[in-house]
């Protein structure tokens, strides 16, 4: 069974973007390439259990086992040594990526307190969009009782678009609620 968001992309977004930007080929139309979820756990330096809990939460949110990220170099001010585990990340592609994006847009973002849309300034100039989430509780998989500490995460949506304008139209077509 094809994903609801993928069908919307094929049936509605591709024709709309082709008309707006005058693409000659369907392959020239931008698409979402991957979504990277990153959770930096700074307090994992003093307590390794925190990283395990964060990784378990990230696995619940994404439906995929996270990769533990390690410090690249030592920083004395943060009491950090090279090679110490300090975060977790997940790269979603294909079916899981569309499922996550659908869940993010239709369920999770509306659960954010005082939500007025995601900022339009978070594009990087190359058509990718970065979104910071302050608490993991907005995701329906995370139970309030199981959370020991509120942690945020970064969500990077990588697209094949060449410009921010193309990427913005793509994400708007997929239902991303941008602030007015």
Curated annotation (Swiss-Prot):
SUPFAM superfamilies: RL5-like (SSF55282). Pfam families: Ribosomal_L5, Ribosomal_L5_C. This is one of the proteins that bind and probably mediate the attachment of the 5S RNA into the large ribosomal subunit, where it forms part of the central protuberance. In the 70S ribosome it contacts protein S13 of the 30S subunit (bridge B1b), connecting the 2 subunits; this bridge is implicated in subunit movement. Contacts the P site tRNA; the 5S rRNA and some of its associated proteins might help stabilize positioning of ribosome-bound tRNAs. GO terms for molecular function: rRNA binding; structural constituent of ribosome; tRNA binding. GO terms for cellular component: ribonucleoprotein complex; ribosome. Belongs to the universal ribosomal protein uL5 family. This is Large ribosomal subunit protein uL5. The keyword tRNA-binding applies. InterPro entries: Ribosomal_uL5, Ribosomal_uL5_bac-type, Ribosomal_uL5_C, Ribosomal_uL5_CS, Ribosomal_uL5_dom_sf, Ribosomal_uL5_N. GO terms for biological process: translation. Part of the 50S ribosomal subunit; part of the 5S rRNA/L5/L18/L25 subcomplex. Contacts the 5S rRNA and the P site tRNA. Forms a bridge to the 30S subunit in the 70S ribosome. Keywords: Ribonucleoprotein, Ribosomal protein, RNA-binding, rRNA-binding, tRNA-binding. The keyword RNA-binding applies. Signal peptide: none annotated. It comes from Streptococcus pyogenes serotype M1. The gene is rplE.
